[in-house]
Amino acid sequence: MKKQRLVLAGNGMAGIRCIEEVLKLNRHMFEIVIFGSEPHPNYNRILLSSVLQGEASLDDITLNSKDWYDKHGITLYTGETVIQIDTDQQQVITDRKRTLSYDKLIVATGSSPHILPIPGADKKGVYGFRTIEDCQALMNMAQHFQKAAVIGAGLLGLEAAVGLQHLGMDVSVIHHSAGIMQKQLDQTAARLLQTELEQKGLTFLLEKDTVSISGATKADRIHFKDGSSLKADLIVMAAGVKPNIELAVSAGIKVNRGIIVNDFMQTSEPNIYAVGECAEHNGTVYGLVAPLYEQGKALASHICGVPCEEYQGSAPSAALKIAGIDVWSAGKIQEDERTTSIKIYDEQAGVYKKALFVDDKLAGVILFGDTRDKQRLLDSLLKQRDISIAKKQIIEPETSGPLFESMPSSETICQCNTVTKGAIEDAVHTNSLTTVEEVKHCTKATGSCGGCKPLVEDLLRYMTNSEYTKPASTPSFCSCTDFTEDDIIAELQRRPFTNPAEVMNQLDWKTKNGCSTCVPAIQYYLEMLYPGFVQPEPATEETCILIPQMYGGRTNAEQLRTIANIIEAYSIPDVSITHGQRLKLSGIKPADLPNMKKDLKMPVYTNEHRHALQSIKACTCGQNRSIQQLAAQIERQLEMLPLPAPISISLSCETDCTEAALQDVGAIRTQAGWDIHIGGVRGTHARSGALFCVTENEDSTAGMIKGLIQYYRETAHYLEGVHQWIDRLGIVHIREVLFEEDLRAQLLESLQTDLSLIQNPTVETGAYKKG
């Protein structure tokens, strides 16, 4: 089949991240052609200030070498700009008069420095700070001149100013506002930062409006609205950026400040997408790395036809990249009538912390002088955790040892590149890594904005500590593959697989048909990802079982009479009572099963439902009918729900006559409400489950049990029992999730969506499709 052609206009970080995501999802789908205006492969523009400050070299900031493009069969045209899009013919035209057709086009033209529209702005010696060429020019100018001025005291302006100072120049920073970094810091943090930078030798001219630049052959003086002026041999414009939308405008694509896109980064023109600093989503143009990478994932999934979450916007976070200064902020920073706040200011230690809350949910954070807990606070911000959790994190930050000791392997260290603690640990052990640079090349952590570099350094130090325990290596899932179970799950989420055979083929299984370990596991995970679409499996058993459903363990004469007639009519050889208080009919001929189901006229479970939730054992002592009613209610709501492994649930009175404490999930009715226990084990190695929580009434009990089951479904491995799952995740973590109302509500909503599909199934022959 002929490949579609995917053309990328722009060879920067956002565009190339899209291509990387596309290659992960389906490396054979597109012929990829990339045009880049600059004469370089993709590099990290964010770290140009680090080059200026002497913290990195130009080679260090290269993200994708020419070999990477060649390895993936990508055609790269450097130093060539797309100047026109013919939407009727689906063609792009470049400044070298090259015409190329496309099936899909991604516009990733980025942004340009905002050069103030004032007299003299075009003189020699006035620069933006955006490209490698800009960086090289500034480094060259610093060798010949002494006085520099930076217009703009945002992130880029301050980083450039410190870089020029590192090169030996006297630097003045000019800013139109009363405080520096006003988009990221409040007045207190801005004042503290300014004081620290002044101690390093920078001079600040605040509330200054630049009106002109003068000089004979080159710029040598800046003039202000108040009549004053400043001598400057070198002037850097860092007063913001403007999205490059000219290409879209000329093609008739809808624009505002940026190119307007939807939640999948599609423009108003079919088959044309936009991403990065040129794109505008819901009225916002993002200039930070993490949001652009999040956009790239949504775009790549949509362009490859893979079901994915829509891009919903991002909570911006920013860290100042200046050695020896710890400043970080995220989300909302200015107070208003809707906000409450927690502030900590230790003047002697030079530490300032502020957390803003809206409706008792964390909405924004500023950290100055101590940013150790920024990753946890960012996680709390993204999940909108309530005030009690965030308050503890901001008041009592953990030192690196306990922080990493308690941090799960799944927690993200590098937000830009979605690199987890576990991925870094695995890379360090597998490849004997010892430096941050080696970790970056192996995992991409620290390779984008650089904000996680201190955290990665701390993790490396912690891993050399005597208290560090090396995590056990994860074996491959089975002998058919080298993938671990988590690897397989990640691939299933990433790619549009249609059946187990396709999974095994595309993931290079060593055996053609898999084995009894991997095939049912893949089947289960696909059903979890696409609920309600079940691939029929050939019957392998010589006989079948059938369990009539009796909600809450209760029945009546009519049901029993019907069951008895069925037993006689079909000569059922074996009838028994299950642990879950149900009748089990065994030894049924497969050919008889369809007619038996019709004759029973009641819900049934058969072999194919072996891991579905079948029954909830309820107290039969007669003290309280509400217990049986609650069991029946939950059974009806969760009927046919697929589970990773068989699960036992029991509801009991205060005497625990159903041994609820020994079940996977058990709820015991008390005078105060309900005690919910989880993780019990029956049999020769019996153990009571741990008390998970206490609920007030039947509704809250049902909600907690259903939320718990859904979280188990979403995070447990195939055939992983509840007690094993608890041991792996930790009961504290599970409590944190289920006790938070918003997260529990999300779980219950997901459960209801899954149930609506499961209980109204569509049978596909060999295919899984999302409804």
From Swiss-Prot:
Assigned keywords, A-Z: 2Fe-2S, Electron transport, FAD, Flavoprotein, Iron, Iron-sulfur, Metal-binding, NADP, Nitrate assimilation, Transport
InterPro entries the record matches: BFD-like_2Fe2S-bd_dom, BFD-like_2Fe2S-bd_dom_sf, FAD-bd_OxRdtase, FAD/NAD-bd_sf, FAD/NAD-binding_dom, FAD/NAD-linked_Rdtase_dimer_sf, NiRdtase/SiRdtase_haem-b_fer, Nit/Sulf_reduc_fer-like_dom_sf
Functional note: Required for nitrate assimilation.
Pfam family name, one: Pyr_redox_2
Keyword Transport: yes
A Gene Ontology biological process term: nitrate assimilation
Record text on cofactor binding: Binds 1 [2Fe-2S] cluster per subunit.
GO molecular function: 2 iron, 2 sulfur cluster binding; flavin adenine dinucleotide binding; heme binding; metal ion binding; NADP binding; nitrite reductase activity
Induction cue: Positively regulated by TnrA under nitrogen-limited conditions.
The protein's name in its UniProt record: Assimilatory nitrate reductase electron transfer subunit
Residues annotated to bind FAD: 43-79
Residues bound to [2Fe-2S] cluster: C414, C416, C449, C452
Organism expressing this protein natively: Bacillus subtilis (strain 168)
